[in-house]
C-alpha cells in the first residue's frame, strides 16, 4: 500500500474539496487515462486495487502510471470512547481527488485493451470516472 515515508505532522484537518482540479488534469506520460468526474477521498487500498486490475488486464506489455498519491492521514477514534482526550490515531492514508484529475495513465497497448483494463480499474473507484485518450502520441 502507498503511504508517505515521512511527514511533518502526524495528523491533519479534514479540509474541503472545492472546485476543479487545477493540476494533474492533462495526460502527460501515456496515451490513455482515467479521469475523475467527482470529488472524493481515494484510499491507498483503492489505488492499489485499481493498479492491480489494470496490470492483470493489460497482460504482458503496456506501462501503467499512477498519477495520484495518498498523502493525507485519516484518523479514527476507538469505538465507545468518551469525547475529549485528543484526536484519534492515523489509521489509513487517502489522496484528495477533485473533478478533472487523472488517476491512472497507460501506454503500449491497443485502445480496446486499454479501455477494458481502465474500465475494470474504474469499477474499483468510489467515484464516477471517464476513459480519456490523447490524440498527440
Swiss-Prot record:
Q: Name one GO molecular function term.
A: structural constituent of ribosome
Renumbered to this chain, the Basic residues biased-composition regions fall at 1-17
Instruction: Name the major location.
Output: plastid
Gene Ontology biological process terms from the UniProt entry: mitochondrial translation
One Pfam family linked to the record: Ribosomal_L16
Keyword set for this entry? Answer: Plastid, Ribonucleoprotein, Ribosomal protein
Q: Which SUPFAM superfamilies match?
A: Ribosomal protein L16p/L10e
UniProt key word Cytoplasm: no
Location comes to:
Plastid
User: InterPro entries recorded for this chain?
Assistant: Ribosomal_uL16, Ribosomal_uL16_bact-type, Ribosomal_uL16_CS, Ribosomal_uL16_dom, Ribosomal_uL16_sf
Reading the lineage from the top rank, the first entry is Eukaryota
Cellular component GO terms held in the UniProt record: mitochondrial large ribosomal subunit; plastid
Subunit organization? Part of the 50S ribosomal subunit.
Name the UniProt record assigns to this protein: Large ribosomal subunit protein uL16c
According to the entry, what is the taxonomic lineage of the organism?
Eukaryota, Viridiplantae, Streptophyta, Embryophyta, Tracheophyta
